[in-house]
Amino acid sequence: MRNSISGKTRLAGVIANPIKHSLSPMIHNTAYKVLNFDAVYLAFEVEQVEFEHAMNAVKTLDMMGINISMPYKKDAYDLCDELTERAKLIGVVNTVVNRNNKLLGDNTDGLGFIGSLKDYGVSVKGKVLTILGAGGAAKAAICQSALEGAKEIHVFKRQNETFESVKRDLEKISIETNVKIMVHGYHDKKAIEFALKESTLIVNSTQLGMGNNNDLPLDEMGLIKESHVVVDLIYHPLETPFLKQAKKSKALTINGLGMLVHQAAYAFKLMTGETMPVDKVIEKLKIELVREKEL
């Protein structure tokens, strides 16, 4: 296994602010090490005023590419030379690849969501989904689920100043994919009860339950059945209060670790041309997350 940096070592990384908490360097560097791939992946905390310079540096430094996290996914989208059709539909990018000194923007978050479901033998094709929350990760999951042939998607979002714009964005995805996507107010009790009865998959994309937060994203936990697949996009903790409660109904539960790694695996493939050793990476991450919990 390679453990030294030379003049031939390639560079990739992630840009966000804040970024010091990111698991992306561990994910990619673990994969490089397992594959003996001569590259290093770093985290770059960049201020808004410097973001465009940082994007240009991907070309200047001949980097393989860069991952983008909050709050720069839309800014990166606007600065790319080319975009995949998937990225155009979602409207933001999380991966920028340096292709012949042109920046190609893509969004692998939705692919990561689908990949995490496949690990459990779950498909969205022909299924009804309920999505709690409508942030960036949710939008990518909604878009990819529609592209993969979901039957119908119910989205529950807080009725704040972004409600109408998000609704318009999702209507665009609905038209492009010919999949019915309905956006409801987060506390629309009648709509949530109907959606849960119709749905196979229930997905939490809110931050409720993250870290030491013990709040549930759903009041109607009694409507979760054994036939449901319950997904939480949170991976810290690995088992949120939402998943613990869903387990009591004997539903299949899936945490966000798989989505995190699979979205990285697609980005890794775009940057390196290699297949990420997903099992080895997940094994390493689980050890690290348990260690952090014990600190």
Role assignments for model-derived ranges:
Residues 2-120:
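Phosphate/diphosphate ligand-binding glycine-rich loop within oxidoreductases
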Residues 229, 233-295:
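Adenosine-phosphate binding glycine-rich loop
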Residues 147-152, 249-252:
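Conserved S-adenosyl-L-methionine
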Residues 179-253:
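Rossmann-like adenosine-cofactor binding region
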Residues 16, 107, 126-147, 157:
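Glycine-rich adenosine-cofactor-binding loop
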Residues 18, 158-161, 236:
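Residues in the short beta-alpha loop(s) of Rossmann-like NAD(P)-binding domains
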Residues 5-6, 124-125, 147, 218-227:
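Short, conserved loop/helix-junction motifs that constitute active-site signature segments
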Residues 150-176:
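NAD(P)-binding Rossmann-fold cofactor-contacting core
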